[in-house]
Amino acid sequence: MVKRRNHEVPKGLLKSWLGREGSKDGLHYIDLSTGALCFEEGREASFAITDYIYVPKRLNGERDDALEDWFAVDENGLAVFSQRAAAGTLASFTNEKLINQAIRACIALGNRSAYSMFMAITASGTADNSAHEFAVANILRSTGQKFKAFSTWEFLVLYNLPVPLLISERPFLDFTPRGHDMVLMALGPRSLMIGTPCDDPSRRQMSLRVGPAGPEHKRIARIHNRMSAEMARQWVVASSRSELAALADELTPEKVLARRQTDRVIFS
């Protein structure tokens, strides 16, 4: 059966940001369409759901679930990987298949936000179901190209960061279009993955290192948070309301709209 409720960021990842509001457990987030600071009880993360976003209708009326199925395969690895990273136990995690799935899932999260999908649908210039199929095909191509580009990179996971991290609907921060060979992604409020090219040109596969963060990593955590807020278009999650309140002036609907007006769709 085709899945209707598509999470643009898996709830298995978002649950690492669970916080409290009074006696209730849930997720603190800013809704960027209104600037409101919100709290959603539970772990469902319904604010990250868009119905049928990855399963466009074909000409015969059926839905194409190839992309959703593709995402689902790697999400299992990401859920385990991120939970271990958040707990600081990733160093003992040696399941190479799940590690590869997790890193692939991280890379895919650079392209799969509902905002990015709707931009691609609009930019296709058609008004029928083919626009949605076109957007899905573009995600498949661009994500495949990124998999190849990062396939020999070195990835470092830091845990126990001194600065709490944010996460948005576009959590995989790719700096390569800006001329910097680096990627960042939060795996939990205190856990960050950093990717950089390998110095060894003979390497044929990606590598992973894990280690505790130190005071010197405050700067990279702050760079991550600044870019997360700058690139967010729908919502931003933090582990506490106070973290979001500190961001509110930079995430007003007016400022987010101004950033949206500079966005462009890149077709692969």
Placement of each model-derived feature along the sequence:
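Alpha-helical structural context detector biased toward long hydrophobic helices
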Residues: 1-268
